[in-house]
Amino acid sequence: MKKSIRTLAGAAALAMTMVAAADSLQGKIEWSRRVAVNTGVSGQVRAIHVTPGEAVVAGQVLVELDPVLFQIRVRQARSQEALYAAEMDAQQADFEREQALFDEGSLSTVQLKLEQLSLSRALAAHTFAVLELEHAQHRLDLTRLKAPFDAWVIESSFELGAYAASDAEAPATVILAERGVYAAHLLADRALANRLVAGTAVTVRVSGQRFAGTVAGTGLEPTTTVDGVTGYLVTIRFESRALIRAGTPCAVDLP
């Protein structure tokens, strides 16, 4: 089945031309990984820390929502956990006293089992309170949107002071492209596609620079560009510390 090739993010298709030389193919550079991230919780945007074109590192805060309501929920959950912890300790002490009486023969088996049941309930209530606290803390953490990996900021739809609804049909996002790793896309005929198996070492040439690359995958179906060129899409990954813009032409020297 033939299909139109599109950029990694679904942008408009750009032509890639196969050349006659058997040892080199022309292609273009794409982002190795391009993702849209959002906060995961809803709230008013308190701060935006990045702008398009900026380089960010993994864990860097991109956007902050107003945390007040989430902080209140954490304090409530922490108080509830402390209360259930105290009740659990008291129930544990009661059970130990009842166990001592049972060992002396002063308490029936039925009464001891009732104490065991009360202790089990106290333990379960405390466990649930701990989970509620962890959940509240997790939601508080989500008010600070962080970069999942080293990246370039492509664009952001967050607006300072606006309400960001995470469950909206089109929620506010920051679009990131992985920094340091790139993909070269090219078309190959069937014979060459059979040669370029995953792991094959190649050389990628971009603007006079050479990079060691590796074939990441080869398409199983032919692809047709908007210019009518047909072939099998080959993806090659390579590393570069410098920015290489998506859509930049490249050449790939084959083994």
Enumerate the language-model features and the residues they cover.
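Bacterial N-terminal signal peptides that target proteins for export
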Residues: 2-9
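Short, conserved beta-turn/loop elements at beta-strand boundaries and strand-helix junctions
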Residues: 158, 218-224
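Exposed loop and linker-edge segments at protein-protein interfaces
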Residues: 49-50, 55, 67, 157, ...
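Short, solvent-exposed beta-edge and connector elements
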Residues: 25-26, 30-52, 58-62, 147-152, ...
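Elongated periplasmic alpha-helical coiled-coil
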Residues: 32, 40, 131-163, 180-181
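Amphipathic alpha-helical coiled-coil/rod segments that serve as protein-protein coupling scaffolds
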Residues: 22, 49, 54-147
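N-terminal signal peptide c-region/cleavage motif recognized by signal peptidases
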Residues: 16-17
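Short, well-ordered beta-strand segments in soluble/periplasmic domains
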Residues: 172-220, 230-241, 251-252
